[in-house]
A protein has these predicted regions:
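A glycine-rich, coil/turn loop motif that links secondary-structure elements
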Residues: 99-107, 169-174, 250-251
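Active-site helix/loop module of the DD-peptidase/beta-lactamase fold
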Residues: 6, 53, 61, 74-125, ...
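Catalytic loop of the DD-peptidase/beta-lactamase superfamily, centered on the K-T-G motif
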Residues: 2-43, 63, 88, 169, ...
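Catalytic tyrosine of NAD(P)H-dependent dehydrogenase/reductases that use a Tyr as the general acid/base
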Residues: 57-60, 171
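Short alpha-helical patches at coil-to-helix transitions and adjacent helical residues
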Residues: 62-68, 107-110, 173-178, 255-258
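Flexible glycine/proline-enriched surface loops and loop-helix/loop-strand junctions
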Residues: 51-54, 161-167, 178, 238-247
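Short, charged, amphipathic alpha-helices and their helix-cap/turn boundaries
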Residues: 26, 35-39, 129-166, 191-211
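The feature captures the short pre-catalytic strand/loop hairpin that immediately precedes
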Residues: 46, 151-163, 230-242
């Protein structure tokens, strides 16, 4: 059986095992093994034709590593410092809004924002299993076509939630913080978030051709088909992109582009200085998790990256709410990206299981 057939068998079995999953994409990039393969199983959309390899989709929070990378390029250029405060970087309405919610913006730094240690409440908290009455996700479901602004989402966090804790004392995953980083990128560069990331990461040099900020940047030419993603019975294609557009998410991409990005990032092919990647992958030292149990700590989180131990090797990457998982193993030069097309998979589904299985399928090459 060829390695492509092995990958195909894996996702065929996945789609068969999880009937709620409309389809699944899998891309494996391992240049040392002469592997650059994408396979698909299932359907393009519920009731539609077969899912096509290379399809595009909303990558949601997998946008965050792009945002962090672009921000660290600004640090290398001396245009911002990780120790600058929100009060300095976001003077004006955003600073005033955060202060009105009890946030000490002169104590919250860019570093805190990039490591989810700012203490700023996540406006999308109910999307991550913290069921809150009439939360942000519920509002989106009521009016999926609403055009959100970044300021609205920050205001939601301030008015709806309370600070997780003083900056630097707790890990609290925060789309709010990522949206603030997006605002900083736009202010410093004078560009849209998508254009700033494109230039600072240097998509052209990396061969990233089908990644863009949805509705803000022009769509690239020769657009691949859309892989429809779902929240329960709702096709999120009807959701205005602004629900997740300003830094916490916002990019549309493909598995292949994501594989090229994560491989280049963790092979240190984007930054100018070796210490930059070391800073980005410096993990937290057992900080307590906001809203977690009293003894729950986080030690695998870095700057918009997470470390995972899978199949006895170390991987770095990030997940996206709508079903994207993108991880790379720099010591083996293997990058694996999957998309399973929905946010609400049943209990027992493990995102990293396919990463492990695909990695094992490379054995013997």
């Amino acid at each position: 059986m060829s390695v492509e057939d092995r990958f195909q068998a894996l996702i065929d079995a996945d789609v068969a095992a999880w009937p709620d999953m409309p389809g699944r994409l899998l891309h494996v990039l391992a240049p040392g093994l002469d592997v650059d393969i994408e396979v698909a199983a299932g359907v393009q959309e519920v009731g539609g034709g077969p899912l096509q390899p290379g399809s595009r989709f909303r990558i949601a929070s997998v946008t965050k590593p792009f945002v962090a990378t672009a921000t660290l390029r600004l640090v290398e250029q001396g245009r911002v410092s990780l120790d600058q405060t929100v009060a300095e970087l976001l003077a004006g309405p955003y600073d005033e809004l955060l202060r009105s919610g009890g946030y000490e913006t002169d104590a919250i730094t860019l570093r805190h924002l990039l490591t989810h240690t700012s203490g700023i409440y996540d406006f999308a908290a109910d999307a991550y299993g913290q069921e809150l009455t009439d939360g942000f996700t519920a509002q989106v479901a009521k009016d999926p076509g609403h055009r959100w602004t970044r300021f609205e989402q920050i205001r939601w966090a301030v008015e709806y939630g309370k600070p997780y804790g003083p900056p630097g004392t707790v890990f609290g995953y925060s789309d709010t913080g990522a949206c603030l980083v997006g605002e900083i990128l736009e202010r410093v560069t004078g560009q849209s978030l998508g254009a700033a990331i494109r230039e600072l990461v240097d998509y052209e040099r990396l061969g990233i051709r089908t990644t863009w900020q949805e509705t803000i940047e022009d769509e690239p030419p020769d657009l691949p088909p859309l892989s429809h993603q779902y929240e329960r019975d709702l096709d999120i294609a009807v959701m205005d992109a602004s629900v997740d557009l300003y830094g916490g998410g916002g990019l549309m991409s493909t598995c292949g582009d994501l594989a090229r990005f994560f491989r280049a990032l963790l092979r240190d092919e984007i930054f100018e200085r070796p210490e930059t990647l070391a800073t980005m992958t410096d993990t937290l030292d057992g900080l307590p998790r906001a809203m977690g149990t009293s003894d729950e700590t986080v030690s695998n989180a870095a700057m918009y990256l997470f470390r995972a131990e899978v199949a006895d090797v170390t991987w770095w990457g990030h997940d996206g709410y709508w079903g994207t998982t993108a991880y790379t193993c720099p010591t083996r030069d293997v990058t694996i990206v999957t998309s399973h097309q929905r946010s609400d998979m049943p209990e027992g589904f493990k995102r990293m299981a396919l990463v492990a299985d695909a990695f094992v399928a490379l054995e013997g090459l």
